Amino acid sequence: MGSSEKNLVELKSFEIDSLNFEYRDSKINFLNSCLTNDQNYLKDVYDALVLGTKDYVEKNNFKGVLIGSSGGIDSALTAAIAFDALGKGRVKTIMMPFDFTADISIEDAGSLAKNLGIEHSEISIKEMYESFSLALKESFEGMGIDKTEENLQSRCRGVTLMALSNKLGFLVLTTGNKSEAAVGYSTLYGDTAGGFSVLKDVSKTLVYELANYRNSLSVVIPKRIIERPPSAELAPDQKDTDSLPDYDRLDPIIEMYVEDDKSIQEIINEGFDEKEVRRIVSLIDFNEYKRRQAPLGIKISDRNFGKDRRYPITNSWKP
């Protein structure tokens, strides 16, 4: 838009809208009785996620969607978006508890489904996990417990969701966010197993903002889900911050490096700890291979992971 031009009115974003006007004697006369020019970033982002989900599911002829509901904020927001996009009859959530799943996680996942009025079920992965562990026992002889056992839990959940997807004809929505994708805080063929990623381009801090925005319309996400420290619950008393910086430090580093093309030194000059910046940048570069195998999803930022940013997977250069 040139300096001499001005925006007279805006139609609604991410939904069908129309405007009637007359152009007479070099003047525009708007005929609609109710025109708004309200701009709300969170509303626009939320509406974009709803429309993107609705379009992908309906235009690809899926009956509905399945969501692994952990009692955490990512799966809760994904379920709320799916509900707003498709309606309650086409959204199913599944809680898949194990030994490290907190009772309040099970309760909150159930409360979320009840608030939305969607179908919810509980399938324990304990028996499946123990069967896998028994089959692998001889191969793992003499080796201690490590991330392998944590990832196995996630992959049991992935197998469960994909089996239900095949049987029901429902699309599995993954629940990972952009912050996790950036640093590889995910399990291939586990929580990345699915057909569409609603929050693929949404940072963790924005996830919280969107959850609060959705609750401002009507309270569907239990307050405790928003207030609890995030955890993958793959080990006793596990928290995301055991492996990552707080998201209010992590997300700005990711944004500057990925979206703004800032160098390590430029990020450090913004007041961030050098050791932390170098670690985060190293994780972003290293985990390109995971992002290449992740489901496609909705773009809401200037640069998403996917077509906007594709770095070599195999190289010996280190920043």
Language model: regions and residue ranges:
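ATP/NTP-dependent adenylation/nucleotidyl-transfer catalytic domains that generate, transfer
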Residues: 2-71, 75-319
